[in-house]
Amino acid sequence: MKIQDFKNKKVMVFGWARSGKAAAQRLVELSAIVTVVNGGAFDTDETIYQKLLAAGVTFINHDDDQAIDKSFDFLVKNPGIPYETAIVKKALVLDIPVLTEVEVALSSFDGRLIAVTGSNGKTTTTSLIRDMLKASGQTVTTAGNIGTPVSEVVGPLTSQDTLLLELSSFQLMGLPDIKPDIALITNIFANHLDYHGDRAHYVAAKYQITKNQTANQKLILNADGADTPDFAAKTQAQVVLFSRDNSSDMAWTDGHDLIIEGEHVMPLTAIKLVGPHNLENILAAITVSKIAGVTNEAIKSVLEVFGGVPHRLQYLLTENGVRYYNDSKATDIEATQTALDSFHEPTIWLAGGLDRGDDLTRLIPNLSHVKLVIAFGETQQKVVAIARQAHKPVITVTSVKEAVPVAISSSSAGDVVLLSPAAASWDQYPNFEVRGDEFVNELKENLGV
């Protein structure tokens, strides 16, 4: 899309979450004729509502398909709204292009575009790239699935700026014209099949990131990915591979050191971010950063201090020789398996949460380094059961808040204290962020830091 594509065009914005508000605001700035549709009532006292109403925006507080007709030129939907929703289905039948907020925002951007997608590791990898670019003295603006709608930040950017986007499969489906200068796919696993229908459609959504790339642009792929040969064969972009071994084109390890283009940059033990999955994220971020002109010294300076994204196996602090990690985002068994396997030190494991019927016995093989289990939440008794099967001591508490002083008093120098619940938070907390914040705040209070 180009900026002129929206001028004087009739555009429906479907969904009134943060991205919908940002899209409506940006479309008004682009001189579009905007209608906003939402399934529920609008807060008419909200500043953005008042501002858009004054600008001539029409608001409709129902989402049946009578709201849309052939007079509309575009439908811009919230990425999370399924394509099976009545309004979206009707738009497609009427051949009305269905876009996301990101497509609207990119219509007016002509600087360097770096885009990151993948099933896992997107946010951590995007954050690493951002910090590496900044450490090298480059100016970069980060947006997308990482939390900030692109429309909120794109206005002041010029052709000299770099825009770094984290993109979900939901967003990519509504980006028909995206053409990144550098595109990265961290990995692809079967994910969001309730939204996409099957794995083939999910993979096709991920391919959208490179569909329009040309020979002077770069596509970075995981050398170990099952879909990598197919993507490499189909894309017009230059393919650059990353891998933990030396099949990588840019960065790899020999088991002891991080090696970038043949230079031994730093020992792996000096990297603050832990876990084999995070090593892949690091190598992917380095590959992007080197293509973007970042020095090895800048990369090293970031890896020495980057402790992770909040709530994602996030290093918090070391006190009295004990290292503390917040992995509240670990809402399923697989995530907690990854977290537990990231440490070889004696580990005090804090776990529990909403009981969704998961088989927690799958975690027993991952408990070899655990010295104490502290259990809470609806799954408390399931956690107790697997601890006993693994012959590990276990203590029950009522909440994360109560677990923290127990963990501190039970720890010794050289230990790791790990919150990795293996369950969603909704039995006791509104979301995993609130649960993780409680862990962080209680640590600070109990440790006096």
Swiss-Prot record:
ATP binds at G118, S119, N120, G121, K122, T123, T124. Transmembrane segments: none annotated. The keyword Cell wall biogenesis/degradation applies. It is found in: Cytoplasm. Pfam families: Mur_ligase_C, Mur_ligase_M. Belongs to the MurCDEF family. Cell wall formation. Catalyzes the addition of glutamate to the nucleotide precursor UDP-N-acetylmuramoyl-L-alanine (UMA). This is UDP-N-acetylmuramoylalanine--D-glutamate ligase. It comes from Leuconostoc citreum (strain KM20). The lineage of its organism: Bacteria, Bacillati, Bacillota, Bacilli, Lactobacillales.
